[in-house]
Amino acid sequence: MSSGPLYDTIGATYTLTRRTEPRIAARIWAALGDARTVLNVGAGTGSYEPSGRHVLAVEPSALMRSQRIPGAAPCLAGSAENLPFDDQSFDAAMAFSTIHHWQDPIAGLREMRRVARRAERGARPE
């Protein structure tokens, strides 16, 4: 995931300029269906993590990890292209507004599929 160095540079004001959009959050949560365990890849500050589920986050930027919102899921340092989890460890995996930053998006999506028990679902903001 190449966004680590980028967000270590520009992420200092991220929480001051970005807010969770309720419509987008609702679409993401609906797309997760009845998934109880969720991996959030390229998680940033955790603002789109669903409540009421067991979420674990992966984020490459130390600065973004340090700005996780109160109550956000535990977050590990890591890359989408090499997720440190066994096959089918989660009901679902999510990634919001991050894939375009990954060094190898195809590898990252394959990794998400590998660690998730169900096929991907997409939620696209309109």
Where do the language-model regions lie?
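Class I SAM-dependent methyltransferase SAM/SAH-binding core
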Residues: 37-82
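Short amphipathic alpha-helix with an adjacent loop that forms part of the alpha/beta core around
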Residues: 85-87
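Local beta-strand N-terminus motif with an aromatic residue
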Residues: 35, 90-91, 117
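A conserved beta-strand element that flanks and buttresses the S-adenosyl-L-methionine
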Residues: 94
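A short glycine-rich, Lys/Arg-flanked "PGG" loop and its adjoining helix->strand segment in the class I
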Residues: 106-120
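Short catalytic micro-motifs in class I SAM-dependent methyltransferases
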Residues: 97-98
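Conserved class I S-adenosyl-L-methionine
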Residues: 1-36, 47, 63-67
